[in-house]
């Protein structure tokens, strides 16, 4: 059986104050966003190694590049997948197996429908800030770009002989935020991020 391409596109959203997200929900998110993809990758590697070719595309997120308020678990799980991909790439070089990350920004999908939201508790010290962030997040998804843009990028990567390690796709401002994080002092970038989230 020949497996030429694996696309790890499964992903689960999760929002809430880190202090208030149940540990079981955190673990479930990592199962979907990190451990699941690793398990599938490991399942196909023997076939790819035998045929001396193969491509794995891991769909991560722009959120993987920074810790986002009330999305810390999601940022962490997707960020971990980015780093795992980098490690896999080096380990798999001798077998001519390619691996890459694709980090989308906001796209108009149904991810919000399946996202776990920590309850908005009236007694929570995060009530006002978390509520504002939730509304903002849902607005970003509703106003997101057409997923066909992402699909076309994935198709072009499959046609590429030597894919890059990382691809970012989506609105310019969201992609540019990664560059800003590298260029700006940490405190300045943190202030910009908090301003964006109206915190």
What are these regions (language model features)?
Residues 9-14:
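Conserved NAD(P)H cofactor-binding loop of Rossmann-fold oxidoreductase domains
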Residues 93-141:
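C-terminal beta-strand-loop-alpha-helix "lid" module of Rossmann-like NAD(P)-dependent dehydrogenases
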Residues 19, 66-72:
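Active-site loop immediately N-terminal to the catalytic Tyr-X3-Lys motif
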Residues 17-18, 25-27:
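Substrate-binding pocket helix/loop in short-chain dehydrogenase/reductase
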Residues 41-42, 86:
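A short, exposed helix-loop element centered on a Lys and neighboring polar residues
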Residues 61:
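Residue(s) in the substrate-gating loop at a strand-loop-helix junction
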């Amino acid at each position: 059986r020949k497996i030429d391409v694996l696309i790890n596109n499964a992903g689960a959203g999760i929002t809430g104050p880190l202090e208030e997200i149940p540990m079981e929900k955190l673990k479930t998110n990592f199962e979907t966003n990190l451990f699941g993809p690793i398990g599938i990758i490991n399942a196909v590697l023997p076939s790819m190694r035998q045929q001396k070719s193969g491509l794995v595309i891991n769909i991560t997120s722009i959120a993987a590049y920074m810790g986002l308020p009330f999305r810390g678990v999601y940022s962490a799980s997707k960020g971990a997948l980015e780093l795992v991909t980098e490690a896999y790439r080096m380990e798999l070089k001798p077998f001519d197996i390619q691996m890459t990350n694709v980090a989308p920004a906001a796209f108009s999908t149904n991810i919000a429908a399946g996202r776990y939201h920590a309850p908005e508790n009236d007694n929570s010290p995060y009530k006002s800030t978390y509520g504002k962030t939730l509304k903002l997040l849902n607005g970003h998804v509703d106003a997101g770009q057409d997923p066909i843009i992402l699909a076309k990028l994935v198709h072009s990567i499959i046609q590429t002989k030597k894919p890059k390690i990382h691809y970012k796709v989506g609105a310019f401002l969201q992609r540019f935020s990664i560059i800003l994080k590298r260029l700006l002092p940490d405190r300045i970038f943190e202030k910009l991020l908090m301003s964006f989230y109206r915190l």
